[in-house]
Amino acid sequence: MMKPASLQGFSSHASSSIYSDVRRPATTPSKMAAFSALSLCPYTFTFRQSSRIKSTVSCSVTSAPASGTSSSSKTPRRRSGRLEGVGKSMEDSVKRKMEQFYEGTDGPPLRILPIGGLGEIGMNCMLVGNYDRYILIDAGIMFPDYDEPGIQKIMPDTGFIRRWKHKIEAVVITHGHEDHIGALPWVIPALDPNTPIFASSFTMELIKKRLKEHGIFVQSRLKTFSTRRRFMAGPFEIEPITVTHSIPDCSGLFLRCADGNILHTGDWKIDEAPLDGKVFDREALEELSKEGVTLMMSDSTNVLSPGRTISEKVVADALVRNVMAAKGRVITTQFASNIHRLGSIKAAADITGRKLVFVGMSLRTYLEAAWRDGKAPIDPSSLIKVEDIEAYAPKDLLIVTTGSQAEPRAALNLASYGSSHAFKLTKEDIILYSAKVIPGNESRVMKMMNRIADIGPNIIMGKNEMLHTSGHAYRGELEEVLKIVKPQHFLPIHGELLFLKEHELLGKSTGIRHTTVIKNGEMLGVSHLRNRRVLSNGFSSLGRENLQLMYSDGDKAFGTSSELCIDERLRISSDGIIVLSMEIMRPGVSENTLKGKIRITTRCMWLDKGRLLDALHKAAHAALSSCPVTCPLSHMERTVSEVLRKIVRKYSGKRPEVIAIATENPMAVRADEVSARLSGDPSVGSGVAALRKVVEGNDKRSRAKKAPSQEASPKEVDRTLEDDIIDSARLLAEEETAASTYTEEVDTPVGSSSEESDDFWKSFINPSSSPSPSETENMNKVADTEPKAEGKENSRDDDELADASDSETKSSPKRVRKNKWKPEEIKKVIRMRGELHSRFQVVKGRMALWEEISSNLSAEGINRSPGQCKSLWASLIQKYEESKADERSKTSWPHFEDMNNILSELGTPAS
């Protein structure tokens, strides 16, 4: 019998926890240990692959080898681990409980956790780690679909990134497309304040501009890299390699660590003749293949497209050919980030002698970033201004526009509506569509093209025209790179689930045995195949994280789907909304039912020529009448809302959002008393007089204490009261007339009576809408106590109103003298702000720092609010930027030297 002590290489219990926070010990052995020397252990261990993704370890009993045999080879070192699962020993057919390696320092050394980009196009964001040390590769956005109304951007789960910020040691960006950098303004605040961000020089220019737009200044954390030059990021030594794409400075990443090598291709294609001369680096891939690639992750976007992509040089020739053939004005549209395509358009303009005009903010954004980085094919200052278009003949112009995807505010889309301020489309125009329709945008792009065709310009587009080439590799290129790299394991990324599955099959066809497909939030463990005692097939599922998508519907609104009420927006857009306002009037002396002025407003609803609206008004009045006299306003709102919702559901099958707002009018006069009073009936005079006393009682006392200039004559008071009574009577009379009109004008269907029409809405007013017994009891208690306290309340109200009027008379507005900043105070603010600069680099919590500056000023006898200090600093920065360009201002402005000492030393200032 085997002693328990000899099994100490395995854990005696299984663990189902995921993502351990334990750091890997520095002395962790690199190989799994055997239970004891082979010459002493009577057991032989075999490793069998489970039907699941996880691997299992099985053992069988055999005779111990002779001591003199070659079994005295190297003894494997012990490696402990937490395992779970069930395995079976095939030798003795005994089913045993086996254990599988799991997370933590004892699990697979290489770990992959996609936060976005798998099973979708866009929002690329992936965690790659060595044990519990991770780097974040890319942080992009995804554009919304039609079932997300009002949303502009979709981002990865920043809450999860914030929870894991102690594990994320660096951010590495592959290139500058929005689906790879667009979420950085939201991701960076979620990370540790010292986490560095690595990117190529052109990509970094785009990142700086994006962060500046959101008020984020982290200059000290932004690091640039160059291809084939290694740098350290977290647990990995990273070597960027050159790949060709539809944007400059696109890089693949080769990650090295002691436990294996990982190749992340980024977005790529193989262009044999790129316009910038930077060809796809096959030599680097061949060298890395010889070194050994444990895991390869590759772009899957165009795996369903057979063959190979065409070169950007072919597109450039096609553009020149079409521009030369055009006799009128030429208008092109393409992706603004494709700097190489803009260079081809510039070449076509130069050959044909046309002037170049850029219409669209994003075009200038990418061009200026490329100009600062030295990669721009066009000098931005050489472009014709948009307002000068009319000064040139159409045959002398080449207009470059945004809007290839029919974005709502893009230049070409606005021109298709005829609402562009830059230019108007004409029948003589030639439009070159040098782009691809992104999946999901087909409908709106086709509508834009239909509007353009209706105006009359000639549209040139399509594959046969060679006006566009994809920036993502086709199937032939994907297969070639798989054969060059020859990875041990392959994980398709960047694409819909269908694309990932097809790319996995392509990997298997090239001879890669270990492939898999995972989804966002699924953590995958990978081990080098030489470490077979850890994982027999190299892959292990380490659990799943429930990620939440984050949404932005503007510059400030940001949150989850529930926080931005996306489902509610969709429901309102589909089923409509009803807004019900009720002005409640409690009954007078001669009445015992509630009355109210009801107004119903609907949006996005079919009203059946007013029939449904009539039914809603009738039901609302009936539901309100069914409520007790002492019914709370909240119960009225709930009762009427429920009735209206049921009516619409039965009438049209929709479930609209119903918003009911009930307000009480304590000064309203009952219609019968007003009518009797105006007709001169003395029997109801006491009721109106009592009401008049209640209404005017407080005003008389307050007016007695007002200044003589504010007093009103008795005639004016009587005239005002009479006008109010007449208005109230008119209001109630109109309401009764309207109610009767609804009853009389409802079109009754043939073969049905008015009673049947009334039964439609009466059936919805059921006992369920009445108050509960506890509510009724509370109402009765309130009703019993109100008469007793009426006299006290009236007298108390009179006193309070009189006191309030007295205080208003005594208080008069005073002129507030502006407290200007003194020069010595400004110097102190500059000094204190400079001392706290490093803390101001943290995006959140800046107001607390301004409060600290304000308190420090208060300690020195200077009373300034945090907002005043912040406004002063913003003004100083603006003045400093203006003074830098003016030599006279440098000497005349007394604070220039102090500001220059701080800002020139610290870099970009944070406000």
From Swiss-Prot:
Signal peptide positions on this chain: none
Positions with a binding annotation for Zn(2+) 1: H175, H177, H245, D267
Chain positions recorded as Zn(2+) 2 binding sites: D179, H180, D267, H494
GO MF annotation list: 5'-3' exonuclease activity; endonuclease activity; metal ion binding; mRNA binding
Name of the gene encoding the protein in the UniProt record: RNJ
Tissue occurrence: Moslty expressed in inflorescences, seedlings, leaves, flowers and flower buds, and, to a lower extent, in stems, siliques and roots.
Gene Ontology cellular-component terms listed: chloroplast; plastid
Main location: plastid
Function description: Essential protein required during embryogenesis, especially in initiating and maintaining the organization of shoot apical meristems (SAMs), cotyledons, and hypocotyls. Involved in auxin-mediated pathways during embryogenesis. RNase that has both endonuclease and 5'-3' exonuclease activities. Involved in RNA surveillance to prevent overaccumulation of antisense RNA. Probably involved in maturation of rRNA and in some organisms also mRNA maturation and/or decay.
Oligomeric form and interacting partners: Homodimer. May be a subunit of the RNA degradosome.
Family stated for the protein in its record: Belongs to the metallo-beta-lactamase superfamily. RNA-metabolizing metallo-beta-lactamase-like family. Bacterial RNase J subfamily.
Cofactors demanded by this protein: Zn(2+)
Keyword field: Auxin signaling pathway, Chloroplast, Developmental protein, Endonuclease, Exonuclease, Hydrolase, Metal-binding, Nuclease, Plastid, RNA-binding, rRNA processing, Transit peptide, Zinc
Protein induction: By light.
Residues covered by the Myb-like domain: 813-877
Low complexity compositional bias, start-end: 63-74
Biological process (GO), any one: chloroplast organization
Residues where substrate binds: A336, S337, N338, H468, T469, S470, G471, H472
Region annotation Disordered: where it falls in the sequence: 58-90, 695-723, 735-824
Compositionally biased region (Acidic residues): 796-806
EC number: 3.1.-.-
Transit peptide segment: 1-70
Disruption phenotype: Defective embryo arrested at globular stage. Impaired chloroplast development due to a disturbed formation of internal thylakoid membranes during embryogenesis. Aberrant embryo patterning along the apical-basal axis. Disrupted transport and response of auxin in embryos. Silenced plants exhibit chlorosis and slight disruptions in the cleavage of polycistronic rRNA and mRNA precursors.
Tagged with keyword Zinc: yes
Protein name stated in the entry: Ribonuclease J
Cofactor details (free text): Binds up to 2 Zn(2+) ions per subunit.
Biased composition range(s): Basic and acidic residues: 713-722, 783-795
